[in-house]
Each structure stands twice: as C-alpha cells, then as structure tokens.
Amino acid sequence: MNNNYYVGLMSGTSMDGVDAVLVSFDGDQPSLIASHTEELPKALLSSLQKLCLPGNDEINRLGHLDRSMGKLFAKAVNALLETANIDKSQVIAIGSHGQTVRHMPNLEMGFTLQIGDPNTIAVETGIDVIADFRRKDIALGGQGAPLVPAFHQHVFGSPNHKRIILNIGGIANVTYLPGNNEDVTGFDTGPGNGLSDAWIQHQLSQPYDKDGAWAKSGTTDQKMLQHLLSHPYFALAAPKSTGRELFNQAWAEQQLSEFGHLSEADIQSTLLDLTCYSIANDALKLSENGELYVCGGGAYNSELMHRLHKLLPNYKVVTTSELGMDPQWVEGIAFAWLAMRYHQGLPGNLPAVTGASREAILGSFYPAD
C-alpha cells in the first residue's frame, strides 16, 4: 500500500471550479494518480466575485465565505479520494492554495489574502493541511507570486532547451527556463482568461468563450488594443504580479467607454488579443526563440493558441501535454509539490522570481487531529 500521496487543491482567479489532484512523488517526476473538479455553486461564485471588489460589510462576508470555501475544498478532496479508492490514511497532507480575494503586494504594507479555511478542510477530510503559501514570501519583501516557477523548474527544466512555461488562468504568468538553474525568472504577464470570460458572461451569459469562437467571429480594433496595452503594468520590469484588483470587468468597461461603436464580438477579439500580445511581447523580451508550453484553461482555447503561434513564429507553441503533464492539472500538482516541500523542510520560492530577500519554507500546518 502506497502511503506517500499528497493532494493539491487549486482554485484560481478565473474561479471556474476547484481542481483537486492526488499525486505521488515516489519517482523523479510527480505522478498524477487521480483528479477531480468540483464546480462552484452559482451563489458562491457570485459572492466571491463581489468580495473581490471593494464593498460594504466585507469582514462578515469574508468570514462566511472563508468557511464556505473550506467546506467546498473538503468536498472536492473527499470526492477525489472516493474516485481513486484511496483511504485518507494514505495521504500525507493536502496542499491548499485557497481562493485569492485580494493580492496587493506593492502597497507600503503589501499583502495577499486567500480564503478557504484550512482548519475546516482538515476537520472535514481527516487529513493534515498545509496552506497559506504566499504570505511568507511577502513578509520577506517578495510579491508572493508567482509561486509555480520553482515547481516548473523542477519538473520542466532542461539543460538543452530554452523553455517558457505559460500558465493561463484568469491571469497569465510565465516561467522562463533558459537551460541553466541560475537564470530562472517568472512573473505575471497580465490578463489571461479573466477579461474575456467576464465580457462573455456579461454579454451572452456564457461562462467562457469555448475555443475562442466568439472572439474569432470578431475583428480586433487596433486602436483599442494599443490603448489597452499602454497600461503601465505591461512596461514594469520583473519581479511583478497582478490580479483581479487591477484587471477586472470594471477596469475593462472604463477602458471601453470611448469604443462604444465597436461590436461586442470585436471587443471580445480585442480582449483576447490583449492577452496574446502581452504574453508574446514578454516572451520575446525573454528570448527571440525557444519552446513555449501552455497550461491552465487557456491551453484549451484553440483561437488563443492559434494567435500565439502567429505572434511567436520562432517558438514551438504547444501545451504541457508534450512534456507529459495534462495542462488542466499543472497548478494543482504544483501545490501538492509545495506541500511536499513543506513536509520535507525545503524552500518553495525562487527569490529571483518573487523578489523575496531569501529562499523560505512556504506554508502553515493545520493538523487534522
């Protein structure tokens, strides 16, 4: 009987569900044993979206949602273990990212806040939980994000190839693996699926633009695209990170105010190109050529992938499936890996990526007993 499993839990800025993965780290590379996605109930999703923006009665709403998300995370874990026919005693720990509701690392007293009470997860599953991975890095002067580059370096690094690992969730982030372990870097490029998801939800009441079909039916407005790309964030040097606090529906609608003559489909196409151009511009700053491996929800958007191909002709643009890892589960596996690093007393951040003053063991421990 294998008693060396970890569970990874991820709910990203796109809020499209809770991903739960069961992972073994017995070999050189992590092995995905089972996976499960728990859908966010509509009422819970709506409450989360409201909490991500400034509003009234925030503390009461946060306290309630913290418990509610903890219960949903636990439900995802229990369903995962039932699917895999694995007993909780075989799992060393759960690595829970939580649901980000604020990420503001650049204030004088920078902070990040993820909810999904780890105590509730531990009690409801009977498994020890490691959570709160980002705040140690911020305490050390870092951005607290992105955290996945250390994992990307471990599993995707190659001494013979220049690789960029691109994760496209609500926000997009890149990890540059230049072929040596000294110069790894990573940062958030800007919007991922978040703006285009919000636009189609608002206009067509669809959760996302499947295969980018609606964007494909429109025509990008170059004036609007250049206006969006003029945002100061895109000119910032790394380390940098961003979130829904900056690139959200309210920001998009503010930018759209002078482009009311455009069709809804043209706006969708332009928002998709904002994602693609901001990614491509940063990729070309890192290297003129190489291999780009895409993971996250954006990997399944065929129009997005097509546009990246066109913008990066000297890159091999494929998904992480070519490296043996399903794009949907990469982030979940990364947080199982971070839990394993905590359990073994090993650092989980890359100071060159986040700007932290040193490496550190990330996370806090929440026992089931």
Curated annotation (Swiss-Prot):
Keyword Kinase (UniProt): yes
InterPro entries: Anhydro_N_Ac-Mur_kinase (IPR005338), ATPase_NBD (IPR043129)
Keyword Iron (UniProt): no
GO annotation, biological process: 1,6-anhydro-N-acetyl-beta-muramic acid catabolic process; amino sugar metabolic process; peptidoglycan turnover
Entry GO MF terms: ATP binding; kinase activity; phosphotransferase activity, alcohol group as acceptor
The protein's annotated pathway: Amino-sugar metabolism; 1,6-anhydro-N-acetylmuramate degradation; Cell wall biogenesis; peptidoglycan recycling
Cited Pfam families: AnmK (PF03702)
Enzyme Commission identifier(s): 2.7.1.170
Catalytically driven reaction(s): 1,6-anhydro-N-acetyl-beta-muramate + ATP + H2O = N-acetyl-D-muramate 6-phosphate + ADP + H(+)
Main EC class the enzyme belongs to: transferase
UniProt-annotated binding residues for ATP: 12-19
Alphabetical UniProt keywords: ATP-binding, Carbohydrate metabolism, Kinase, Nucleotide-binding, Transferase
Function: Catalyzes the specific phosphorylation of 1,6-anhydro-N-acetylmuramic acid (anhMurNAc) with the simultaneous cleavage of the 1,6-anhydro ring, generating MurNAc-6-P. Is required for the utilization of anhMurNAc either imported from the medium or derived from its own cell wall murein, and thus plays a role in cell wall recycling.
Assigned protein family: Belongs to the anhydro-N-acetylmuramic acid kinase family.
Protein name: Anhydro-N-acetylmuramic acid kinase
Originating species: Shewanella pealeana (strain ATCC 700345 / ANG-SQ1)
